[in-house]
């Protein structure tokens, strides 16, 4: 397995171009199953999860082409089984369920894997599709959906806010007969991006970005072109990198409006922030890093995907900061690794209390999930000495070309092939 070797005590400075958002690109790719015409996508990040999604689409019968941009044609799809071999590596594969059931009346999707940060129940997806008329059985490790004719519009009240649940049901509803209303819907920017994509293909989705979605089903969707929105979590990760190393970094081709909760906390931590329509600059030069109190919650509150990075920020700031995780259980697996580097962090249930650490020390640490791995890389830049981060296949799932981007900012990081 590949690993990263990081030489510490370095400062990140310069400009970095932000990639397209993984969490927007994946549902958009699955949404191509709703249409039998050619679709051209730009700003799709080159990531392991994107490659897995394209492989799954091809296994279902689609034709894909990658040449900088991504072209998908699903007219020849003749298979409705998303097998365990692919689904086990990526939880987002559950997003094939709604489109396959809506367009073909049949979907067999293996129960998902690919993530170690806690249970993400599929019952929300199943219950919503059942309300729309699908008959669903869970057997042999698969969710098996069958539809007699077309799905029917329904009123769906989601028990809890779920991004993938909202996305799956929204996609299915675009081809249902009648109107579907989804209450307690996720408001995340990635949900909005998916809705905008669907509307570009002829869907009728209203209310994206609010907690109530209204979808009027249409007979069919047509082909088209679409550009995936920038990755707000990648943006936030580079900004935290500048903050913890005392540097100055400008993120280009991003959208400041997508991470307001993060920017507020970075300013609270002592950073000077400037922003324009598609750029953000964070300057920490000569400034003192202060701890912050954060509590993760669904958008527009503080994102759970930035929690690990801010745990590092609090660990190296002067004073005591608190991080409360309310979205996922088991999402502090980076903490024992940071403690190995000398961080003074105490876990009390879903709260991490981060106390002033005089100096992190380089160590051999292990990545346990996507965002945890990014936090360990940032900690390595702050630490004294060298840090080895093992199992970086996690980071390759969600950060495009991360070592070269960090090298461009002055980071001393190299990939050691396994």
From Swiss-Prot:
As stated in the Swiss-Prot or TrEMBL entry, residues carrying the post-translational modification 2-(S-cysteinyl)pyruvic acid O-phosphothioketal are 115
Q: Pathway listed for it?
A: Cell wall biogenesis; peptidoglycan biosynthesis
In its UniProt record, which GO terms are filed under biological process? Answer: cell division; cell wall organization; peptidoglycan biosynthetic process; regulation of cell shape; UDP-N-acetylgalactosamine biosynthetic process
What EC numbers are recorded for this enzyme?
A: 2.5.1.7
Q: Does the keyword Lipid biosynthesis apply?
A: no
The source's domain of life comes to Bacteria
Chemical reaction(s) catalysed = phosphoenolpyruvate + UDP-N-acetyl-alpha-D-glucosamine = UDP-N-acetyl-3-O-(1-carboxyvinyl)-alpha-D-glucosamine + phosphate
Q: Pfam families given for it?
A: EPSP_synthase (PF00275)
Q: Name one GO molecular function term.
A: UDP-N-acetylglucosamine 1-carboxyvinyltransferase activity
| Localization | Cytoplasm
- Key word Cell wall biogenesis/degradation present in the record? yes
Provide the binding site for phosphoenolpyruvate: 22-23
**Which catalytic residues are annotated?**
115 (proton donor)
| Membrane-spanning residues | none
Sorted alphabetically, the keyword list is: Cell cycle, Cell division, Cell shape, Cell wall biogenesis/degradation, Cytoplasm, Peptidoglycan synthesis, Pyruvate, Transferase
Q: Which family does it belong to?
A: Belongs to the EPSP synthase family. MurA subfamily.
Query: What is the recorded function of this protein according to its Swiss-Prot or TrEMBL entry?
Result: Cell wall formation. Adds enolpyruvyl to UDP-N-acetylglucosamine.
What's this protein's name?
A: UDP-N-acetylglucosamine 1-carboxyvinyltransferase
